[in-house]
């Protein structure tokens, strides 16, 4: 949990401070969780765990269950870093549900080399069941797990996230 506390308690406040100091903003308009590959996994986890801090999410080619790293092992720490698992059990009356429903999030994955879209689809089904409007998008079989595609996907989705 140290990584979460570092980002929430140190990195985001520093971003807010710098945005005010350098841009004259009284408050940072919003922090979007963004990442590719393992960064996408972290972006989704940060956004889902703290939508009060992160106003949106763009995640490209992530894996959203801890099963890939931990197999069938599960303790509280693993559970809290496995979005498929904790969102499956997320209570409908939790205050974060309203935040999820009023923010923009995109989760995208290709189907080409080195991509693993199965957990993306697991999250899609969970979001649909909970009426959380996340844009879950699967790109073609030619779209591989690599930077050239992530550049294209970022350019494609960022206007939606920022709009």
Predicted regions and their residues:
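Non-catalytic cap/lid and distal C-terminal segments of serine-dependent acyl enzymes
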Residues: 1-163
């Amino acid at each position: 949990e140290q990584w979460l506390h570092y980002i929430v308690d140190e990195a985001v406040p520093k971003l807010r401070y710098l945005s005010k100091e350098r841009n004259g903003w009284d408050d940072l308009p919003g922090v979007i969780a963004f990442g590719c590959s393992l960064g996408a996994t972290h972006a989704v986890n940060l956004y889902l765990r703290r939508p009060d801090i992160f106003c949106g999410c763009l995640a490209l080619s992530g894996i959203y269950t801890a099963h890939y790293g931990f197999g069938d092992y599960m303790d509280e720490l693993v559970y809290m870093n496995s979005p498929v698992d904790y969102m499956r059990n997320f209570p409908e009356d939790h205050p974060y549900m309203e935040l999820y429903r009023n923010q923009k999030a995109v989760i995208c994955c290709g189907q080409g080399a080195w991509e693993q879209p199965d957990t993306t689809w697991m999250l899609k089904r969970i979001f649909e069941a909970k009426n959380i409007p996340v844009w879950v998008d699967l790109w073609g079989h030619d779209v591989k797990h690599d930077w050239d595609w992530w550049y294209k996907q970022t350019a494609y989705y960022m206007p939606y996230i920022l709009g």
